């Protein structure tokens, strides 16, 4: 016989469909790419290495945008879904930390240590000390932290060498999708990225239109779906600048 109750809640991953459809002209690349691959020639077939280059180029652009969307995306914006920061702002369970005033200049090397201290103080006991716990910071705030460590004379190296991205035993993870003044702390297992199929994020097609319409164009097509969420809001800390 049960002597207590358990309340269950659910959070969903609902992937959003995206598509990339670019059309490029091979003539723009002939002098600096095709000439290297096949010598001076009037043949316009796309060499395999050029196709690989296009795939890598487009994939890197998509990855950069996806990184930003994962953290600060908004579903109302074209090509985005609600990112982790937007979801956390709407969740009363998430632990909010008011940071230094944006009007005072936000985070810099002079206050980054104190502001990270506020984040650590807010981390709940249920996850503090866990191996998967990380503090996610922007690239700009990471630079401020490195400079602050140098000023403090890290390992007597000062401005020489590389600073460990660690704060009071907690790993600092540089998330390029975050903006300066926004910091997230939580376990990596609490953060979820989902697609409709495991292979969705690496499907790219190259279509050479020379055999279709006789043009010198190449079409790069990518279709995928993605979204993010977290499991337990009460085990997530969100730091933002004060007004």
Segments from the language model and where they lie:
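Alpha-helical scaffold segments that mediate packing/assembly in large oligomeric complexes
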Residues: 33-121, 240-243
């Amino acid at each position: 016989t049960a002597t207590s109750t358990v309340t269950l809640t659910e959070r969903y991953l609902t992937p959003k469909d995206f598509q990339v459809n670019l059309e490029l002209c091979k003539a723009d690349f002939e002098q600096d790419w095709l000439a290297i691959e096949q010598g001076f020639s009037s043949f316009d077939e796309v060499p395999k290495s050029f196709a690989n280059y296009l795939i890598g180029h487009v994939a890197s652009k998509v990855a950069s945008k996806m990184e930003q969307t994962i953290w600060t995306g908004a579903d109302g914006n074209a090509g985005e879904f609600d990112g982790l920061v937007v979801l956390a702002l709407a969740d009363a369970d998430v632990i909010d930390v008011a940071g230094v005033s944006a009007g005072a200049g936000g985070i810099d090397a002079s206050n980054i240590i104190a502001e990270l201290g506020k984040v650590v103080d807010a981390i709940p006991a249920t996850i503090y000390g866990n191996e998967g716990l990380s503090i996610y910071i922007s690239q700009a705030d990471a630079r401020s932290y490195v400079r602050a460590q140098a000023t403090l004379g890290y390992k007597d190296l000062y401005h020489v060498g590389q600073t460990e991205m660690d704060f009071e035993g907690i790993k600092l993870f540089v998330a390029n999708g975050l903006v300066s003044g926004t910091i997230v702390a939580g376990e990596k297992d609490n953060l979820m990225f989902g697609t409709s199929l495991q292979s969705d994020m690496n499907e790219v097609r190259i279509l050479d239109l020379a055999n279709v319409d006789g043009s010198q164009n190449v079409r790069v097509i990518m279709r995928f779906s993605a979204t993010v969420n977290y499991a337990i809001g009460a085990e997530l800390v969100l730091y933002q600048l004060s007004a």
